[in-house]
Amino acid sequence: MVPRTPWHDEALVVFGEVARDAARHFIQWWNIHKVFSFSNRLFILPKTYDDKEELTVHNWKEFLEDHPCQINGQCVRSIGPWSASTKTTETSILNAYIQMIDGAEHFIFIENEFFVTVANDSFIQNPVSETLYQRIVRAHRLGEKFRIYIVLPLLPGSDNVNIVQASLYFIMRSIAKGDNSLFKRLEIAGIQPNDYISFFGLRQYDILMGRLVTETIFVHSKLMIVDDQMAICGSANINDRSLLGERDSELCVVINDIEEEQCLFNGRSVRVGKFFSSWRRRLFSMILGTMRHNENDIDVSDPVSDQFYNYFREVAHKNTLIYEEIFGVLPTNCVRRFDQMYNYTDKPKLKDTDPNQAHEKLKNTQGLVVDYPVYFLDEESYLPSLRTREGISY
């Protein structure tokens, strides 16, 4: 057996017309691949529905703990001639991301396995970074209180060194490495990036066979929640493979909440979706460690205020410093060049020099959140050689 890193994912259960559309997408995909692969498996025929009553699900209590919420949903896809034999390439997932980011009024929360989106780049074509940049610039110009939280895996999920290098290289180029990165473009525009946008990872610790150990939590979600009013969730990563429609086939659901409730954002009363607000609060509570024990009475309902945004960042940074001192974790902002790597990793680690003190310090960590190391190896170029498959593919 090969041990697997801890895993974090988010998903949806949907009923009604949007579920029917998801089924029809699968049928279309299944049938065209049967043709291409000359498989003996049977074709699937979609069921015909005469009215909406047939779509009603009465046995939801068998697989849901709580009563389902009412929402408006729409399936969106990345799909094209090669993957589904369509006449045109469909990029409705990308269109949804762009429209939702541009229309966000208060905050954006993203969990994704990738963040590969570079403006003005000859390789990376999707405009997610440009849209985030323009939304932040607009917030800065108008004096708006606007926040973006992005949670990513601390390392790409692969045991292939070339894949890890290539993925990490382009993620860092997207965030802070080079003049076309999101952070650098904001700084050139006179904007402090962390006033509006922050990147985070997830990490945990435990005692294994009498020794303190730590492990990153691999974020596999493909989720964006906007203003606690709408969301997109599905299979699409934030990269060209998932968003341009000409490569991987993807399916997501865009959801608007119907049931609303009152909430305060930065001291202002706003209407938020009942479903999305509860979903986002649950995620923040898990990330900050307040789901079961909330000794400091932290209110996660307002993601916009300076108080909460700074608290979120402070918890992440405090946790990061503790993990670096005790375990010498990688990746880290302490290592910006290869020649700094060994100096950092060779330093005595508190888990070895004083395990009892290390364990006491680890009790001061809160939740799972840590800083995303946006400046890790930012003075180095580690893109795999173009002679490798991974170097060519990017």
Predicted regions and their residues:
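Charged, low-complexity intrinsically disordered terminal segments
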Residues: 1-394
